[in-house]
From Swiss-Prot:
PROSITE patterns: TRANSALDOLASE_1. It is found in: Cytoplasm. GO terms for cellular component: cytoplasm. Belongs to the transaldolase family. Type 3B subfamily. It catalyses: D-sedoheptulose 7-phosphate + D-glyceraldehyde 3-phosphate = D-erythrose 4-phosphate + beta-D-fructose 6-phosphate. The active site is at K87. Pathway: Carbohydrate degradation; pentose phosphate pathway; D-glyceraldehyde 3-phosphate and beta-D-fructose 6-phosphate from D-ribose 5-phosphate and D-xylulose 5-phosphate (non-oxidative stage): step 2/3. This is Probable transaldolase.
């Protein structure tokens, strides 16, 4: 299981990186806007800054929704750094663009995936990653983790090399459910990654150890 952090915040990326468990970063236009990063050139400089922190894959999303625009933007993004993975929405022109990028050796992350059918098309087109959105499906009373498990089974049955990147993860519980479902990658907020470390018995045990140590060393 790989851990990606889902943010454009450099401080959070550094903190996750310093834990020693970070394998990559995913971003999107909403996350860029949240950090107040405006304009194409500023966003691309920001991607380069992220790549300078993390040695793993960094997903950078195209803004265009037409085939020609996605191909143009994707090539420009891929040229920024070898770690860039071009993030493409799962729409008809997006699938076409993924197929084009696959033939050119440009790695892709097919995003906004909500069904096994979409995941199948992404894999057939040669996507490096496919991103089923767990939390957003849960929001409408559908089974997000179940979709992850279904995609994993499908890919293994047909031997597709596309990696399942569980996205829209809201909690540490989501992470562990996606681990059990067989996801290759979980991309999540820093709070969810740090939440995996927390357990009341760990805190209580450490407190007891320190108290006992002080008693015999006073």
């Amino acid at each position: 299981m790989k851990f990606f952090i889902d943010t454009a915040n450099l401080d959070q990326i550094r903190e996750a990186h310093d834990l020693g468990v970070l394998d990559g970063v995913t971003t999107n236009p909403s996350l860029m806007a949240k950090e107040g990063i405006k304009g194409v050139e500023n966003q691309r400089r920001h991607y380069v800054e992220i790549c300078n922190i993390v040695q793993g894959d960094v997903s950078a999303e195209v803004i265009a929704t037409d085939y020609e625009g996605m191909v143009r933007e994707g090539k420009e993004l891929a040229a920024l750094n070898p770690h860039i993975v071009v993030k493409v929405p799962c729409i008809a022109d997006g699938i076409k663009a993924i197929k084009h990028f696959s033939g050119k050796g440009i790695r892709t992350n097919c995003t906004l995936v909500f069904s096994t059918g979409q995941a199948l098309l992404a894999a057939k087109a040669g996507a490096t990653y496919v991103s089923p959105f767990v939390g957003r499906l849960d929001d409408i009373c559908e089974d997000g983790v179940g979709l992850v498990a279904d995609i994993v089974r499908m890919y293994r049955f047909y031997n597709y090399p596309t990696q399942v990147l569980a996205a829209s993860i809201r909690s540490s519980k989501h992470i562990m459910e996606c681990v059990e479902a067989g996801a290759d990658v979980a991309t999540c907020p820093l709070s969810a990654i740090k939440g995996l470390m927390n357990h009341p018995l760990t805190d209580a045990g450490l407190k007891k150890f320190l108290e006992d140590y002080k008693k015999v060393n006073e």
